[in-house]
Amino acid sequence: HMEERYRLILSTVFNAIGLKVEVEKMIATGRIDMVVQTSRYIYVMELKLRNNGGKSAAVGQIADRQYLEPFKADRRQVIGLGIELDDEGKGLLDWGTAE
């Protein structure tokens, strides 16, 4: 599955540079594709292929399922990222933020 390949690549890169990464994190309202934590930020990432709704579907899912809520009590800034990926393996096409 193409989304899984992208998730593996991204998590490997984030781990390699020393960031804390959680893949397919379960919360009460669903499963977050990836959570990446730095000393100042928490990035909540949803990955969608272009042929599966892309950026707008990813950003919408973060908002609709309230993926940012479990992290709001943390002192760090929480940023939702909806990431659109090419379904033919050509890379990241677009991204947007979710509040």
PLM features per residue range, with description:
Residues 11-19, 61-81:
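Metal-dependent nuclease catalytic cores in nucleic-acid-processing enzymes
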Residues 46, 56, 92-95:
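Short conserved micro-motifs at the rims of enzyme active sites and ligand-binding pockets
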Residues 51-62:
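Active-site-adjacent loop/helix micro-motif of nuclease/hydrolase catalytic cores
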Residues 13-39:
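Active-site metal-binding core of divalent-cation-utilizing nuclease and nuclease-like domains
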Residues 10, 34-36, 40-51, 65:
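Conserved catalytic cores of phosphodiester-cleaving nucleases, focusing on short active-site segments
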Residues 30-32, 43, 76, 81:
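Structural beta-strand/beta-sheet cores of well-ordered domains, especially the beta-sheet scaffolds
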Residues 70, 74-99:
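Domain-level recognition of nuclease-like catalytic cores that cleave nucleotide substrates
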Residues 1-6:
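A short, highly charged nucleic-acid-interacting micro-segment common to nuclease
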